């Protein structure tokens, strides 16, 4: 009973120690906390944070100054700070903000609110409150003559202004003037705003702000803008000094960019969007196209796999030095963005283009999932929705001349209000898993909501797209058309949007689904049936074999077409077939003229005329080789005509078409380390085609194929979603691995077994993947691993996240986040972020910060002057971002930041007559944020040079509560505790430290042993529960790192002690399930101190790898001992393991000691060691002996009881006989047999004697006999009288009936 009691006691002790850091403290609420601070100055700000028991936190900021915003329940200002070198320029910036909000109680259920802009309007006091923001910013910069070599260090922090966590309309008018001429020696400062809904850590959004309150109204100072030429933010991914432009914006010209770079570990994806801006450096783009004097350059560039490429675009002959990935740009009036993706193993590229006309220089750029009010001319708006199971993509843009607000038949989340000449409207609705509807309306004349419709008006084209989602198949229809009214013409590809001149607008609907088929139909009709009748304008008949080839040159690139096996049903059809072997040099296209005429095709037929004049000159060769095989395309139709470049064919009558596809397809690229080859199976389908281009470039995959050409559509229904778009149209591919390609500035959509959704064109990106995901943003490298969907968060946009771990969120009406450089020279700053975000309509986030060594804080002064000071922390800092008003569960994201700062000082001048403090504590999170007011402080200005690298790791397990800093024993304590370890010391230690949950043995895995060094000895690990938790949590990650994290079932079974005679401490040995095929490779990596096992890891995993003792074998402790113990059958071979008192310590059975030279002994329960195995065998024998002994004792006890019973009976009989001997010694001397015979004889003799005596004598004898008993013995006729004292006389009976005394005979 002592051992179970000791186990129970140790369990209670360990539980008590772990209770200090129990994960339940982060899950359940701890009551209500309130923090309120008020200044006694003229302007007051109060902050209240309430956390209820249902894991919901509400933050309330009430601010008023001079009675302007008196006691309004809304966030007034959320500002961030960044330090810029004061020697570069002198800047002064002012901004004024007024907010008001209008909503009703019923609106909260359906997320429908009415918003409008106003100026200095107070909120209503009725039940229907009113809220609307208005921003006005002006900045003046004066460049100095000093040109510092360091970059401008600006923190990227979103500015959120929200009320009740509901999005609202934001109107921004930004004007920037430069007082100094721009020369090559003048330093350039750029203005960037948060316009993407992708990443809150994007360095493309530097915003430097300070909060100031005057006597009349509140003002919001924004001080991070300068110059007409944007400064390219530094992104040093390989410890070099090269600068890659990720995102920049120049608001002096009518354009704005959005950049999102996403890199996946298993299937990396990069998505970028860029717009036009002016530069002063002299360089040529990789590829450009000049349209009618202006420049509209689609630039395509590829880099090696695994590298992060940047994107930029220019609009004048003097190009930027930045090497752009993919961009399209039109000078003077259009802004376009192009997205390209580069993957390491499976390729995926997605591109889209947006362009719109600019009438006045004042242009506002609105991010996704928000609405925009344009006061002058035009804007583009993109709305994207992400779903848990069916993530669609929807993007539209364009502009029309319209005065009235665009109306929509459906209730969408985004709307546009027009004040001036033109604007564009994009409508998108959040969907369930059953339906998707998208409508784009460009003018007051609206199209009906049907499957597909288009309407050409005086101001442009309005199109409506509706997509019904079926259970097994789906067809979507979309149309893109435009009218040209000015010499400036932009080429509009399919599945991308563009606006030419000032009177047209297209629509784009692109969706990617995990398991639901998606088909793209033409503008004329959609049919959800499994086959579609083909209507075309060309006739003819041809049957080609695989040997026939045809070559042609298209647009400056060489292409080779090879015919595949073709079978046609009609006697006379025309065949469009090709197998292209194209090698592109990415040459600079000097000029390009594209004219398109479309009478808006109908079901009967269509005619399209396309001409292309492209002259190419050699430039830097980018050698991209595509080997594609296309199907033979045979069509027939009613009597119609189709005119293409150089040919015309007409036919009469109606006929059908059949397509037989059976040919291989392969894709290769020099920039990819691998080559993908796809073998095509035979497939037959009938489709609807309207062909209007000179050639078709398609690719055949494992499934049925449909094609779409310019201003036409191809629809096909099959069991697997596959859609191909060529000739300035979209291309998509579905295969077992996500692979897709982009041609001629067109979009690419992908459908794979893994639900992945990518949305570009100023829209948010949502991803759901079962594979590790790595996100990379500008000026930072972000790596993410998640089993769930983890999007990023940006300003004024929605973020959606689904996680297996519910993490409570914090609702805040104001959020401030800032991380600046350290104030200490030559200091490495290391920070760790933990991010948890969720909520489709959340507009603000709360910030908490915790420092491990040096406290980091954000100091804000809320007083009459409302100045802000920030200080930075060095070493290790932890930030926790929690999304506002999140109702769903969210997964924690951990971000590790390491910032080397050679020299850094902060420049801040604060004049604060009165101070106040604001403190916020976010419940259910492991960090906190504090805003502390300080008095007037003057710091010396100096330059700041810093670069950060972010690593984002998402995990849905329960290891988030484990400390990230490795816990080890101090060297002094280890030396003190490492005295001689004996049997008496190990008796108090547990035999093993098992995993928290049951660990099954995976298939193909083997149990190995990983030993640790003295700093993690067994006694220390037992005494420090968090240290053992770190071994269970981070050792599998350390073992999986050199294998690129491809194994998912590496788990630690238990931690056991191992005693080595050559060591003075107990070695902690972790028993780990590891893939059998990689054990030898792991052993080689562990024995090599410079291998990837010790160098590739990051954070705690790398520290854990450094603690592994390479002298401990991986397999010897388990398998050799099993064989040795199994071979020893006699008791002598294993007796040494059982004898605890022998003290010899012989290890004759241990195969480890004989092979490695170290005599390992088991101090606990390393049950797979040699000693333990012999103990097991001996223990089994001992158990048998104990069982036999117990049975013998029980049987012996039973026999003893029976013996005692018989002995007791015998003793009782003996005592009775003894008493009889004492009473009758004469009788007792005679044997019972003799006594019986003699008695019978005497009785007979007496009877004979009595017969001869008289009657009176007989009476006397009878009386003697009756009184004294039968006393006549030994032939005595006289009675022998017994002792009267011991005898009992008998009562006489009647002698005779005649006389009771018998005297009649006497």
Curated annotation (Swiss-Prot):
Segments for region (Disordered): 248-267, 519-539, 561-580, 665-685, 709-849, 1123-1158, 1272-1291
Question: Which stretches face the Cytoplasmic side?
Answer: 1207-1306
* Residue ranges with Polar residues bias: 519-528
The record's account of how the chain is modified after translation? O-glycosylated in the Ser/Thr-rich regions.
Q: Topology in the membrane?
A: Single-pass membrane protein
- Assembly and oligomerization: Interacts with CDC42 and SHO1.
Q: What is this protein called?
A: Signaling mucin MSB2
Query: Whose protein is this, by species?
Result: Saccharomyces cerevisiae (strain ATCC 204508 / S288c) (Baker's yeast)
Gene (name only) = MSB2
């Amino acid at each position: 009973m002592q051992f179970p009691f000791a186990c129970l006691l140790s369990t209670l002790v360990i539980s008590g120690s772990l209770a200090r850091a129990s994960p339940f403290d982060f899950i359940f609420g701890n009551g209500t906390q309130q923090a309120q601070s008020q200044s006694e100055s003229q302007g007051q700000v109060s902050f209240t944070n309430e956390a209820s028991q249902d894991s919901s936190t509400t933050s309330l900021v009430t601010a008023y100054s001079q009675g302007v915003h008196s006691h309004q329940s809304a966030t007034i200002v959320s500002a961030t700070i960044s330090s810029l070198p004061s020697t570069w320029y002198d800047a002064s910036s002012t901004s004024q903000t007024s907010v008001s909000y209008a909503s009703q109680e019923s609106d909260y259920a359906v997320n429908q609110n009415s918003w409008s802009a106003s100026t200095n309007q107070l909120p209503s006091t009725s039940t229907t409150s009113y809220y609307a923001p208005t921003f006005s910013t002006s900045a003046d910069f004066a460049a100095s003559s000093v040109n510092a070599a360091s970059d401008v260090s600006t923190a990227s922090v979103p500015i959120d202004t929200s009320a009740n966590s509901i999005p609202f309309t934001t109107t921004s008018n930004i004007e920037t003037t430069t007082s100094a001429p721009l020369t090559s020696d003048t330093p350039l400062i750029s203005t960037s705003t948060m316009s993407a809904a992708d990443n809150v850590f994007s360095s493309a959004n530097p915003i430097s702000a300070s909060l100031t309150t005057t006597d009349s109204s509140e003002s919001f100072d924004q001080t991070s803008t300068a110059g007409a030429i944007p400064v390219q933010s530094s992104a040093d991914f390989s410890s070099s000094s090269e600068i890659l432009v990720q995102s920049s914006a120049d608001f002096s010209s009518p354009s704005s960019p959005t950049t999102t770079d996403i890199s996946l570990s298993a299937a990396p994806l990069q998505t970028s969007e860029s717009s036009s801006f002016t530069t002063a450096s002299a360089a040529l783009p990789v590829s450009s196209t000049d349209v009618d004097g202006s420049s509209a350059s689609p630039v395509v560039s590829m880099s090696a796999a695994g590298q992060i490429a940047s994107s930029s675009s220019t609009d004048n002959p003097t190009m930027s030095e930045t090497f752009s990935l993919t961009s399209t740009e039109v000078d003077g009036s259009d802004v376009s963005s192009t997205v390209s993706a580069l993957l390491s193993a499976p390729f995926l590229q997605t591109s889209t283009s947006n362009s719109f006309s600019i009438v006045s220089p004042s242009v506002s750029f609105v991010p996704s999932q928000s609405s925009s009010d344009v006061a002058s001319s035009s804007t583009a708006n993109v709305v994207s929705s992400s779903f848990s199971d069916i993530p669609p993509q929807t993007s539209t843009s364009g502009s029309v001349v319209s005065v009235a607000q665009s109306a929509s038949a459906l209730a969408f989340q985004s709307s546009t209000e027009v004040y001036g000449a033109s604007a564009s409207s994009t409508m998108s609705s959040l969907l369930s898993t059953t339906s998707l509807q998208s409508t784009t309306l460009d003018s007051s004349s609206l199209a009906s909501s049907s499957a597909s419709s288009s309407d050409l008006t005086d101001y442009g084209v309005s199109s409506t797209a509706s997509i019904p989602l079926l259970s097994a198949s789906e067809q979507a229809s979309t149309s893109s058309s435009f009218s040209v009214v000015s010499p400036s013409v932009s080429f509009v590809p399919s599945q991308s949007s563009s606006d030419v001149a000032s009177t047209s607008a297209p629509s784009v609907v692109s969706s990617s689904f995990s398991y639901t088929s998606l088909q793209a139909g033409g503008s004329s009709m959609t049919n959800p049936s499994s086959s579609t009748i083909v209507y075309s304008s060309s006739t003819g008949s041809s049957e080609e074999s695989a040997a026939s080839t045809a070559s042609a040159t298209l647009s400056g690139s060489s292409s080779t077409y090879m015919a595949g096996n073709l079978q046609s049903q009609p006697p006379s059809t025309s065949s469009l077939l090709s197998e292209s072997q194209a090698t592109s040099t990415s040459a600079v296209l000097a000029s390009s003229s594209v004219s398109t005429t479309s009478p808006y095709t109908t079901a009967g037929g269509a005619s399209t005329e396309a001409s292309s004049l492209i002259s190419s000159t050699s430039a830097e060769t980018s050698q991209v080789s595509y080997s594609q095989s296309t199907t033979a395309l045979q069509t027939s139709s009613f009597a119609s005509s189709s005119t293409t470049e150089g040919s015309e064919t007409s036919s009469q009558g109606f006929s059908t078409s059949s397509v037989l596809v059976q040919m291989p397809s392969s894709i290769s690229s020099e920039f990819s380390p691998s080559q993908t080859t796809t073998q095509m199976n035979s497939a037959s389908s009938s489709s609807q085609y309207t062909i209007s281009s000179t050639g078709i470039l398609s690719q055949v995959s494992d499934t049925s194929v449909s094609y779409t050409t310019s201003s036409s559509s191809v629809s096909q229904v099959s069991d697997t979603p596959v859609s191909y778009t060529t000739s300035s149209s979209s291309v998509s591919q579905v295969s077992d691995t996500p692979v897709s390609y982009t041609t001629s500035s067109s979009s690419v959509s992908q459908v794979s077994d893994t639900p992945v959704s990518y949305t570009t064109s100023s829209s948010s990106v949502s991803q759901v993947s079962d594979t590790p995901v790595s996100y990379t943003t500008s000026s930072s490298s972000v790596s993410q691993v998640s089993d769930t969907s983890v999007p990023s968060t940006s300003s004024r946009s929605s973020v959606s996240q689904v996680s297996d771990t519910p993490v409570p969120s914090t609702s805040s009406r104001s959020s401030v986040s800032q991380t600046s450089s350290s104030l200490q020279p030559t200091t490495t700053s290391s920070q760790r972020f933990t991010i948890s975000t969720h909520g489709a309509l959340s507009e603000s986030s709360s910030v908490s910060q915790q420092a491990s060594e040096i406290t980091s804080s954000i100091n804000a002064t809320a007083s009459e002057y409302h100045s802000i000071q920030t200080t930075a922390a060095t070493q290790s800092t932890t930030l926790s971002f929690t999304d506002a008003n999140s109702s769903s569960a969210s997964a924690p994201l951990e971000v590790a930041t390491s910032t080397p700062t050679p020299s850094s000082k902060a420049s801040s001048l604060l004049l604060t007559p009165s101070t106040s403090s604001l403190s916020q504590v976010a419940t259910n999170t492991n960090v906190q944020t504090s805003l502390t007011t300080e008095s007037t402080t003057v710091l010396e200005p100096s330059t700041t040079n810093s670069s950060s690298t972010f690593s984002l790791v998402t995990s849905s397990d329960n290891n988030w509560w484990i400390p990230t800093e490795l816990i080890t024993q101090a060297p002094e304590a280890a030396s003190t505790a490492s005295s001689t370890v004996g049997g008496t010391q190990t008796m108090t230690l547990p035999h093993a430290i098992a995993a928290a949950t049951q660990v099954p043995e995976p298939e193909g895995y083997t149990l190995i042993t990983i030993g640790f060094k003295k700093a993690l000895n067994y006694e220390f690990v037992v005494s420090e529960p968090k240290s053992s938790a770190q071994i269970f949590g981070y050792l599998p990650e350390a073992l999986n790192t050199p294998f690129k994290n491809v194994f998912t079932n590496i788990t630690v079974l238990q931690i056991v002690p191992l005693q080595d005679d050559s060591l003075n401490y107990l070695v902690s040995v972790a028993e780990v399930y590891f893939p059998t095929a990689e054990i030898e490779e792991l052993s080689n990596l562990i024995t090599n101190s410079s291998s990837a096992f010790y160098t590739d890891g990051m954070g705690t995993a790398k520290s854990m790898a450094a603690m592994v003792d390479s002298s401990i074998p991986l397999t010897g402790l388990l398998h050799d001992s099993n064989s040795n113990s199994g071979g020893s059958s006699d008791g002598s071979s294993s007796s040494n393991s059982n004898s605890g008192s022998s003290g010899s310590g012989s290890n004759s059975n241990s195969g480890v000691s004989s092979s490695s030279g170290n005599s390992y002994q088991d101090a606990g329960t390393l049950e797979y060691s040699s000693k333990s195995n012999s103990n097991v065998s001996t223990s089994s024998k001992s158990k048998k002996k104990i069982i036999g002994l117990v049975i013998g004792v029980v049987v012996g006890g039973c026999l003893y009881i029976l013996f005692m019973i018989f002995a007791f009976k015998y003793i009782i009989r003996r005592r009775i006989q003894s008493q009889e001997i004492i009473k009758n010694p004469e009788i007792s001397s005679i044997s019972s047999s003799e006594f019986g015979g003699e008695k019978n004889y005497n009785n007979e003799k007496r009877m004979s004697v009595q017969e001869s005596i008289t009657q009176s004598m007989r009476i006397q004898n009878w009386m003697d006999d009756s009184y004294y008993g039968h006393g006549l013995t030994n032939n005595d006729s006289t009675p022998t009288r017994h002792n009267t004292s011991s005898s009992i006389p008998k009562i006489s009976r009647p002698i005779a009936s005649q006389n009771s005394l018998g005297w009649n005979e006497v």
